[in-house]
Amino acid sequence: MQLNASEISSFIKDKIADYDNKVENKAEGTIVNVSDGIVQIQGLSQAMLGEMIELPNGNFALAMNLERDSVGAVVLGAYEHLREGDKVHCTGRILEVPVGRGLLGRVVDALGNPIDGKGKIDAEGSSPVEKIAPGVIERQSVDQPLQTGLKAIDSMVPLGRGQRELIIGDRQTGKTAIAIDAIINQKNTGVICIYVAIGQKASSIASVVRKLEEADALKHTIVVAASASTSAAMQYIAPYSGCAMGEFFRDRGEDALIIYDDLTKQAWAYRQVSLLLRRPPGREAYPGDVFYLHSRLLERAARINAKEVERLTAGKVKGKTGSLTALPIIETQAGDVSAFVPTNVISITDGQIFLETDLFNSGIRPAINAGLSVSRVGGAAQTQIIKKLGGGIRLALAQYRELAAFAQFASDLDEATRKQLEHGQRVTELMKQKQYAPLSVAEMAISLFAADKGYLDTVAVEDIMAYETALLSFMRENHADLMNTINTTGKYDEAVQTGLKEALDAFVEKRSL
């Protein structure tokens, strides 16, 4: 074959012209050990804490231990295929999850991947799972109510938008039920809800999703599921992922509610990861930074002022504040609130709703202990009519519990004590509420008005719930305008007071016929 010199010259020139002199500098390391979802990597001296490390199959690991000659990373996903000697690379990125309205009505895993079989998610962007909480200057005081629809909570331990209120109690005391009722009650309020399920049975999560669908509440809710079958790393990350999704709405001048169900299991998952990484154990074998684990998460729930919203949206949203309200759940063992994780979370949050097994088993549901439950900032945000009418409820219940214990030993009681006991029994009965049946502000106000003004004093204790149902039905049929006024304004003026008195007098008269 005859080679032409000019052809060879042209070929070489073309190759030189096409040559790209770009050098790609990639930090590469080698896996030296794989066990229980943890990889030890050598040669990644440039790795940063919390950085994503690319694994051979396209999966990622999270760098959590930076040692002198190796990096300890936790694998996000399957790790069975990883072998000693596999090459890994630094990415220079931190973990991000998809955010936006496209997530509403969907069930996703801790990384934001859909697991509900409804196809791809149309996200508006992505956000880092770890973010610094808003500073003091960016915050605004809590002064807007967040109604749960539960009489016992909205009257005694009111919640405000931007608050952190702990729900604490033993297993099977109705903690999740309170959270689900709160989500259902936000249906037409414009509040976006995020439900983060951590370490729960997949069947329990499916049951919650089905209940939200039945109540038509899934369309304003994002469910982040890290079930008991997922890795400890996923259970540890899930709350931060859910928080990032909620912050998207908060930073755009909207209101969001996030429920962490529950943070005890997240602490267990973090303890497991920390022990596998050979971190030194402390009290109850938790690592030294378990307080920071929860404080950096819960401090991100806040109400931010209009100026900060305007800055975050580059001037697109003006004159609106944004809020992220958190309802973390903690499971106690045999009512022990002095354990490590419960005391940590109690000290971080703005109050707690304490649920008792004894109350639950005696049929008082929601099983809220009025004496131990408190809302430190919600009082400033409480609706006026509920604040005025519900003021005596907590006192009546606290006095009743005290007197009931004393009355067990007393043979004869004076008239005043007997009346107080009877009033307490009726109030206790009135505070009972069926699951998945949240009440509006007006319905709540009517029930509290009846208790406050003595309308229940002539009703037998066992008939209180039936009396309340009949009363609310009567009000909906005959006094819808008054109820609309209460729901719209939330005020307790003379006109509302007169209207309620006339309505209840008419109901009593009708009932006596």
Swiss-Prot record:
InterPro entries, A to Z: ATP_synth_asu-like_sf (IPR023366), ATP_synth_asu_C (IPR000793), ATP_synth_asu_C_sf (IPR038376), ATP_synth_F1_a_nt-bd_dom (IPR033732), ATP_synth_F1_asu (IPR005294), ATPase_a/bsu_AS (IPR020003), ATPase_F1/V1/A1_a/bsu_N (IPR004100), ATPase_F1/V1/A1_a/bsu_N_sf (IPR036121)
Gene Ontology cellular component annotations, sorted alphabetically: plasma membrane; proton-transporting ATP synthase complex
GO molecular function: ADP binding; ATP binding; proton-transporting ATP synthase activity, rotational mechanism
Keywords: ATP synthesis, ATP-binding, Cell inner membrane, Cell membrane, CF(1), Hydrogen ion transport, Ion transport, Membrane, Nucleotide-binding, Translocase, Transport
Reaction(s) catalysed by this chain's protein: ATP + H2O + 4 H(+)(in) = ADP + phosphate + 5 H(+)(out)
Keyword Translocase among record annotations: yes
Enzyme class (EC, first level): translocase
Enzyme Commission identifier(s): 7.1.2.2
Gene3D superfamilies reported for this sequence: 2.40.30.20, ATP synthase alpha/beta chain, C-terminal domain, P-loop containing nucleotide triphosphate hydrolases
Top-level taxon in the UniProt lineage: Bacteria
Main location: membrane
Recorded topology in the membrane: Peripheral membrane protein
Intracellular or extracellular location(s): Cell inner membrane
SUPFAM superfamilies, per database record: C-terminal domain of alpha and beta subunits of F1 ATP synthase (SSF47917), N-terminal domain of alpha and beta subunits of F1 ATP synthase (SSF50615), P-loop containing nucleoside triphosphate hydrolases (SSF52540)
Site-annotated residues for Required for activity: 373
Binding site for ATP: 169-176
Family matches, as NCBIfam families: atpA, PRK13343.1
Assembly notes: F-type ATPases have 2 components, CF(1) - the catalytic core - and CF(0) - the membrane proton channel. CF(1) has five subunits: alpha(3), beta(3), gamma(1), delta(1), epsilon(1). CF(0) has three main subunits: a(1), b(2) and c(9-12). The alpha and beta chains form an alternating ring which encloses part of the gamma chain. CF(1) is attached to CF(0) by a central stalk formed by the gamma and epsilon chains, while a peripheral stalk is formed by the delta and b chains.
Record-stated family: Belongs to the ATPase alpha/beta chains family.
Function: Produces ATP from ADP in the presence of a proton gradient across the membrane. The alpha chain is a regulatory subunit.
Protein name: ATP synthase subunit alpha
Protein species of origin: Dichelobacter nodosus (strain VCS1703A)
Gene name in the database record: atpA
